[in-house]
Amino acid sequence: MFNIVLFEPEIPPNTGNIIRVCANTGCRLHLIEPLGFELDDKRLRRAGLDYGEWQSVVTHANWDAFIKQQAPERLWALSTKGTKFHHEVSIGEGDYLVFGPETRGLPMEILEYITFDNVLRIPMLPNSRSMNLSNAASVMVYEAWRQLGFAGSK
């Protein structure tokens, strides 16, 4: 399936919701530290997570450790700075979808590393500032899975 990457996430319920999305879709979740919470935070548990859902979660000490450990072939960043809509590209099996922290988004050095050709945005009304992280991750995962014909779903 796909890999969801949360760079320095800050809000536990968002991460909890994304863990559930990963469990429901077969995605693997990568959390890049520092995190704005502890992984045993009860607010993560409020998302109704079962023990088995945690099997898809991997933590990395920082961005460089993530790149070294995963050696991702293709990264897609989600940002309000994106020049392409999320549905205008072909997302493939094993691709990595990278999201920034809730209050500040991805830093410029990561957007540059990924390259701006792979920085996507989700359409919003002009006066909207940003989407909730867990909502944006859900939109992206289901669009990517749709492109694969919802392979493996029931």
From Swiss-Prot:
Q: Which GO terms describe its biological process?
A: wobble position cytosine ribose methylation; wobble position uridine ribose methylation
Pfam families per the record? SpoU_methylase (PF00588)
Q: Which cellular compartments is it found in?
A: Cytoplasm
Task: Name the CDD domains on file.
Answer: SpoU-like_TrmL
What terms describe the molecular function in GO for this protein?
RNA binding; tRNA (5-carboxymethylaminomethyluridine(34)-2'-O)-methyltransferase activity; tRNA (cytidine(34)-2'-O)-methyltransferase activity
Provide GO CC annotations from the record. cytoplasm
Subunit structure and binding partners: Homodimer.
The entry's protein name is tRNA (cytidine(34)-2'-O)-methyltransferase
Organism in which the protein naturally occurs:
Saccharophagus degradans (strain 2-40 / ATCC 43961 / DSM 17024)
Q: Which gene encodes it?
A: trmL
